[in-house]
């Protein structure tokens, strides 16, 4: 189970962890690290089954906690096909929201190439009419698909991660449709659900 947490409210993970409402949950570090649980995809590849993790961020977590009673799934390039299928079964109207990046220094928002492409990958697997915004995301994904890794490594946030030694994070996040996991927000935490809608 992954509990999204509003990152801008956390300045001391030790203090926040001691008062967290999720008994037994471990806090993932806000600073990207491959050696401990963090926002780095590499750090989560060996996470034990059944572990509870609190993941703080200023983009995806904030959006997740703002959806209220609306059924909410977490999608990306890795699980685009599975999430699209599950969303399509859940309702006729689907909103796909690229999270972007929230800057810690001034709280400003930066739209991200990789989030637009990820949204397009999910849209590519949906049927039905599309908004103009969805059409643009779909076109962007189709244009990028044949050179996905190269473009992800060369986009703004990709270059920043490469410079910091996290090129593997980019490549890992850029793997298309390699996961059937569908994370659904249930009682404040993302749990894996089957495409029939039942938690696993």
Ranges and model annotations:
Residues 4-94, 101:
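Acidic/Gly/His-enriched mid-domain segments of enzyme catalytic cores or analogous surface patches
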Residues 34-71, 112-200:
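Long, charged alpha-helical interface segments
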Residues 11-13, 105, 191-192:
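Short secondary-structure boundary/hinge segments and terminal tails
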Residues 1-2, 180:
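Residue-level detector of short coil/turn "hinge" positions at structural boundaries
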Residues 93-100, 134-140:
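Noncatalytic linker/hinge segments flanking ATPase motor cores
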Residues 101-115:
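Phosphate/ribose-phosphate-bearing ligand recognition and processing surfaces
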Residues 3, 8-9, 153, 175:
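Active-/binding-site microenvironments in catalytic and ligand-binding cores
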């Amino acid at each position: 189970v992954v509990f999204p947490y509003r990152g801008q409210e956390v300045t001391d993970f030790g203090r926040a962890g001691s008062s967290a409402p999720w008994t037994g949950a471990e806090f993932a570090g806000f600073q990207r690290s491959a050696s401990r649980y963090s926002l780095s995809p590499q750090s989560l590849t060996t996470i034990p089954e059944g572990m509870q993790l609190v993941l703080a961020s200023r983009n995806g977590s904030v959006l997740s906690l703002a959806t209220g009673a609306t059924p909410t799934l977490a999608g990306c390039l890795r699980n685009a096909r599975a999430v699209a299928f599950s969303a399509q079964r859940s309702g006729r109207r689907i909103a796909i929201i690229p999270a972007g990046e929230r800057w810690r220094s001034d709280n400003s928002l930066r739209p991200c190439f990789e989030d637009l492409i990820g949204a397009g990958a999910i849209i590519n697997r949906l049927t039905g009419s599309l908004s103009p915004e969805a059409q643009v995301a779909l076109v962007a994904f189709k244009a990028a698909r044949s050179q996905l890794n190269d473009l992800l490594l060369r986009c703004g946030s990709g270059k920043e991660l490469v410079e910091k030694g996290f090129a593997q994070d980019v490549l890992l996040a850029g793997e298309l449709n390699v996961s059937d996991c569908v994370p659904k927000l249930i009682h404040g935490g993302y749990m894996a659900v089957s495409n029939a809608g039942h938690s696993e």
